[in-house]
Every structure is written in structure tokens, then in C-alpha cells.
Amino acid sequence: MRVRKPAVAGYFYESDREKLLQQLEWAIKHELGPKAPQIPKLGAETLGGVAPHAGYIYSGPVAAWVYSALAGFGKPDVFIIIGPNHYGIGAPVAIMKSGVWETPLGRVEIDGELAEKIMRYFKELEDDFHAFSREHSIEVQIPFIQYFFGDVKIVPITIWRQTLSTSRELGKALANAIREYGRRAYIIASSDFNHYEHHDITTKKDEMAIGKILQLDETGLFEVASKFDISICGIGPIGALIVAAKELGYKNVTLLKHATSGDTSGYREETVGYASIIFYR
């Protein structure tokens, strides 16, 4: 059995189980956090949302928002976690269709059945364990999932070829696979927003991009990111989620929380933007 060991425990989040649980509780109760492990659900059903993936001390309170909102809709059978490939390792679009991911909170199993269905609808997806070896954008979501939902399966997908066409193909494949799967699946698009500019600039750039997400406009998202140099590291995963949402009839999108690393660290000269966004109907 393939075991993906933690790559950033002790760096992005606490490596000790009890300290990690305390850190997750801190994120929830933080002044920028949701304050509660579950907020009232916004609609009848959810498809998932966008969550940041920086170190918990920076983005944890914002990330807690989307998981608190998802918890209001109940526990899914599986989380599909789509992240950017920051290191360019492995296949252009990679998936793991078997094995487990390990964190200080325990192991989560990959849902091979759903992974196979996604691969059948998107032929360019490659089963590539190596592509995930260092990638933190997926890893940092898993302790949140374990804390809020307990034992639940995952399907990890990572993208370094972040084009609009890739997002569309993947989004349609996800929609088709979820329909065929017939059980409850939530998608997490793991992404930070603008990088390494002053808090005020990052905030304004982020707002332009978030506006397109709220309009379910994947084309507009890619266009504003290019035109205004908005460095959204997970634009491909977000685009795929938007496409899947439209295919499956999830037409409501709500921004739960937007902040920058300047809000959590106090250093506002070079910041990274974070947003929690939920898709529902």
C-alpha cells in the first residue's frame, strides 16, 4: 500500500497530534475565524469550496471558515482535493487512485472507485504518486478535514499545467464522475490568492478575482489574473470547481472570509491573499 507521509508537518502546521488539535481550535476561535466548528448551512446542498493552503498561523483562521460552513451541510463520503503543483514534479495533471495519506491525526484512505471514474472521463490524468511527494497544497487541507469530519475518504489531484482548457476538462470530468458515483462528494479547490505585494494592493487584486468566482466565470477569472498580474497559485483548481459547479447545477457562491497574511501576521508590506468561498444550491 502506498503511504504518502507528511511533508510539511512541523513547518506549515504542528507535527504533534495534541498541539495540532489545539492549533485547529485556535484557527476556529481566532478573531478572523468562524468562531464555531459549524455554521448554519446556506442552502440545501453544497459542492465544496475554495480554501487557502499557507502555514496555519497565516491562513488557518480563513481556511476554518469553509470547513465550518461545509460541516453545516453534513459529512460527505469523500473529499476531492485539487491543488496546484508548486514544484513541477511529475505529471501535468496527476491523481492518486490508491493508498493513504498520513497526518499527525491519523490516516485517510483514497477512494479508488471515484478516482477511477474521474480518470475515465479525463484521459490525461495520470496516476502519479511522485507528483504529490512534496506538495503542501493538498496536505494542509487534510487535518482540517479530519478535525471537522473524522474518518472520510479523499481523492487528491494536483495540476501544474494550469490552463483554462485543463480546468474545463477536469471540471467536466469531475461533474460526470460525481453523477455516476451517486454519493456525496465535496470538492476543495486549494489556492492562495495574490502573492508578495502590499496588503492594500493584494486586497484590491484579490477582490477582482473573487468577483469573477462569485459570478461562476472561469474565463473572466483567467482573464483578470492575466491582465492585472494577480498571482493566484491555484487558479486551475478554482477553474475546475467553477466548471463542475455549473455542470451540476450549483449556482450559488458566497465569500465567507477574505484576508491577507498582513491581517494575521501584522506585516503588511509583502502579503499573500486568502479566501474561503463556498458553492451550494
UniProtKB/Swiss-Prot annotation:
InterPro entries: MEMO1_fam. It holds the Pfam family Memo. It comes from the Archaea. CDD domains: MEMO_like. Belongs to the MEMO1 family. This is MEMO1 family protein Pisl_1105.
